[in-house]
Amino acid sequence: ATLVALIPEQTIVVDESNTSGFLLPQATAGAPAHDWLTLTGGAIGYALPVSVGAAIAAPERPVLCLESDGSAMYTISALWTQVRERLDITTVVYANRAYDILRIELQRVGAEAATGAGPKALSLLDLTSPTMDFVRIAGGMGVPARRVGTAEELADALRWAFAETGPHLIEAIMP
């Protein structure tokens, strides 16, 4: 509901929210006209560079990049490119502090903890030691950033980011 109310018309949405975004296309069906670029395979880490490409290809249109924390780390340097090229990209990083999509894939092939994946293997899917701070990472590359923990805070942060052109990052802490 937050995106439907706030997404600017003609936004290009780049969606790599693998475990938290399954219903987003349907949820934004009533939003102003926009385009949706989404993950079509199993690879992760594509959303940040794809958002850069979308912003360069259509500089008159805002870009909303929906990314997860684990995937973002594959191509985090794209934030620097966003600043360097003065691209109008709002990046929302869903921070669930884990490679949840990889946990799901382990379950799909029957390799859960009880059936084979040991504690060491499962610990490799955890992103809390150390916990990544995307607000500081973004700031270090020159991207204005905020951290949010509620839907209301997310709405406020989206209003802030959409109000001015240029790159912005919102780290959304997921339960």
Model-identified regions with their sequence ranges:
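Structural detector of well-ordered beta-strand residues that form the stable sheet scaffold
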Residues: 13-14, 37, 64, 90, ...
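Short acidic, glycine/serine/threonine-rich loops at helix termini
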Residues: 23-29, 49, 76-79, 101-106
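Thiamine diphosphate
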Residues: 85-175
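Active-site diphosphate/adenylate-binding microenvironment
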Residues: 1-60
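A short, small-residue-rich loop immediately preceding and capping a beta-strand
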Residues: 60-74, 89-94
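Short gly/pro/ser/thr-enriched loop/turn and capping motifs at secondary-structure boundaries
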Residues: 21-22, 43-45, 72-73, 97-101
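Short coil/turn segments at beta-strand junctions that form active-site/ligand-binding loops
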Residues: 9-11, 61-62, 87, 166
